[in-house]
UniProtKB/Swiss-Prot annotation:
GO cellular component: extracellular region; immunoglobulin complex; plasma membrane
Complementarity-determining-3: annotated span: 113-119
UniProt xrefs under Pfam families: V-set
Superkingdom assignment: Eukaryota
Function: V region of the variable domain of immunoglobulin light chains that participates in the antigen recognition. Immunoglobulins, also known as antibodies, are membrane-bound or secreted glycoproteins produced by B lymphocytes. In the recognition phase of humoral immunity, the membrane-bound immunoglobulins serve as receptors which, upon binding of a specific antigen, trigger the clonal expansion and differentiation of B lymphocytes into immunoglobulins-secreting plasma cells.
Keywords: Adaptive immunity, Cell membrane, Disulfide bond, Immunity, Immunoglobulin, Immunoglobulin domain, Membrane, Secreted, Signal
Annotated spans, Complementarity-determining-1: 46-52
Name of the protein: Immunoglobulin lambda variable 4-69
GO biological processes: adaptive immune response; immune response
Predominant cellular place of this UniProt entry's protein: secreted
Amino acid sequence: MAWTPLLFLTLLLHCTGSLSQLVLTQSPSASASLGASVKLTCTLSSGHSSYAIAWHQQQPEKGPRYLMKLNSDGSHSKGDGIPDRFSGSSSGAERYLTISSLQSEDEADYYCQTWGTGI
């Protein structure tokens, strides 16, 4: 039984040594004309390119609205009632939200979020 603490310590050191800080970076702002398209970018920090993210929208005076979960392979699942004009894609550590045929109600803050585990 003397090996148990050593094994635990080895696993603990391995886990803590493999952690690196996860940071999401978004493009600061974007603008486009009604009817046009816009592409927003969320970049995962080095070593986290396999992570999924979620895109959210927050219109003025309203709570956040879940738009979609976006995986590293570009597959995504949208929230209820999200129009087809909203789509997601991925390339390496970058996750994109594209809004096509912009409408006035699309004027909002958009932000990305992750859960801190690779998927």
